[in-house]
Structures are given as C-alpha cells and as structure tokens.
Amino acid sequence: KYKIITFVLMKLLRKIFLPLNLVYFLVVFLRNKLFDCNLLESMSFDFPVIGVGNLSIGGTGKTPMIEYLVRILMAEYKIAVLSRGYGRKSNGFVMSGDSVSSEIIGDEPYQIKNKFPDIIVAVNNDRKAGIELLKKNNSNLEVVLLDDSFQHRKVNPGLSILLTCYRDLYCDDILLPAGNLREPIN
C-alpha cells in the first residue's frame, strides 16, 4: 500500500513540476550553447580521457562500467580513475591512498580503489583541475577514466560512453524536474 501511495504522490508532484521543465530546458540549452560556441572553455588533453556518463538521474551502471574499463586497460596502461566523489566529507582534490576512507573520497571511488589497489583513484569536483593534478603527480599516467562525466563539459573527453537503463529509455522520459533526464535527448 505504501508503494502505491508513493507512486501516486510522485506522479502528482511530477505533473505539478511540469511547467518548470521549460526553465530547466532553457538553462541547460544556454549552457550547452555557450560551450558549443567556445564562450565557455572545454579542454582536451594530449592523452586518452574516457568519460562515462548518462542522461538520466539514478543508477545506470556507471561505476560497474568504469570497473570493466579498468579491467580491460590496467594490464597495458598506467590508468587513473577520477570521480566527483559524491557524498564525501572532504573538498577539493584528494588522491586515494592506503589510509583513505569512503568518507574522504566517497563510496564508489573507495569501492574502485579496494577492488583495484594498483591503480590511481582520485576525486575532485573540478574535472579539468583534477586531470591536471593527476598528470602533474603521475608523469607516467597514460589514460584517465572519468566517472559520471557527461554533464561536466569543462573537459572534452576523447571518448564518451553514454549509458542507459534498458527499462527507462530516454525516448519515454522528459527533463527534470518533472522527469528523470538531466539533458535534452538531442
């Protein structure tokens, strides 16, 4: 019964928020146009940067995809994973070490570091600065994997991998706040 009430309440709230979709769309559209016209800077790097992201809120398997890429690449390349570190209690650039906790770097980067102790895992809200600091501190770094990077346009990855959940197709959804999409489909 509780699930039904919650579902109905969420449907009602999304209908109430529907007029705000236009405002959200305009903000996202303008921001993207500023990047597209080079009025806001997007930096590319002279080594491979692979971004993994999605258009919708919620879990689509970004961290498992990062882990899959780590498994593929770590035998051949010196790699680093850079995440925002969602939910962490620290600020700025933090590189994981033996004594770093999930409170300092966030749950998902901590999970990645525990599974792959030989790779570099770092967190920074500013992806551009994070990549620069990773390269400065690790001159032999060859590949950077960006976790949840699709909306962070200050960095232009050489390859972007966009994930979706097979149950929640983009074509069946609308923008926030009435829907789950962070970006317009196009």
Where are these regions (language model features)?
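A transmembrane-helix-recognition feature enriched in membrane-embedded lipid enzymes
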Residues: 7-48
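Alpha-helix C-terminal capping segments
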Residues: 6, 73-74, 116
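Walker A (P-loop) phosphate-binding motif
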Residues: 32-98
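N-terminal, well-ordered alpha-helical segments
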Residues: 21, 28, 50, 67-71, ...
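Phosphate/Mg2+-binding loops and adjacent switch elements
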Residues: 86-115, 119-186
